[in-house]
Amino acid sequence: MNIIPCSIKTLKGLYDISGVEVGQHFYWQIGGFQIHAQVLITSWVVITILLGSVVIAVRNPQTIPTDGQNFFEYVLEFIRDLSKTQIGEEYGPWVPFIGTMFLFIFVSNWSGALLPWKIIELPHGELAAPTNDINTTVALALLTSAAYFYAGLSKKGLSYFEKYIKPTPILLPINILEDFTKPLSLSFRLFGNILADELVVVVLVSLVPLVVPIPVMFLGLFTSGIQALIFATLAAAYIGESMEGHH
């Protein structure tokens, strides 16, 4: 006789739990829109770091490169090689896009461990790496999707869409689904790895403040760099695939 009241009570409890938010966020109200300010603030910091580094690197170029100029030339050469390997001989126009993706994600990931975000106090929530937020990673993935659609359409025109019915029209649903899963996998892989890394460090620091978290932080820096490389490599591979028309 008490089954129905118990079931209702259980459902009510589950409903209450579903309304609980994990963490707090700081928002700006601009017009009728609610803007996630934390991500914008940290993204602007990362962009400022990148632009400042570029200005310093090209401010006074030398015929015989200095250490700083050598470093940035090495980074550029690395990005060019990555783009050429994945895209092919028509890689040139895509070097800025791939380079921007790689450097923004790399610096964003490292900023979570190296920049003292905690000293900046907000009315709600706290600052963290931009890639620690799903909004950032989804935006980067959607930009990548737009890029490889543009690459395919600019080279092949409307015949680009023939790839959806090749080698047989039976694969049409699977080929369409693939274009939805690409941005999903890109965004959730990056978001999950960065969020997990920061959570592990926070937990270890709260439990054992000294010594133990340091190796984990170094491991996190390594994996953060790898995640930036994976994202940039896949973005270049998708662009190359859309231009070549093979899977």
Swiss-Prot record:
Membrane association type: Multi-pass membrane protein
Principal location listed in the UniProt entry: plastid
Origin: domain of life: Eukaryota
Transmembrane segments: 38-58, 95-115, 134-154, 199-219, 220-240
Key words, A-Z: ATP synthesis, CF(0), Chloroplast, Hydrogen ion transport, Ion transport, Membrane, Plastid, Thylakoid, Transmembrane, Transmembrane helix, Transport
Subunit structure: F-type ATPases have 2 components, CF(1) - the catalytic core - and CF(0) - the membrane proton channel. CF(1) has five subunits: alpha(3), beta(3), gamma(1), delta(1), epsilon(1). CF(0) has four main subunits: a, b, b' and c.
HAMAP family tied to this protein: ATP_synth_a_bact
Stated name of the protein: ATP synthase subunit a, chloroplastic
Record organism: Agrostis stolonifera
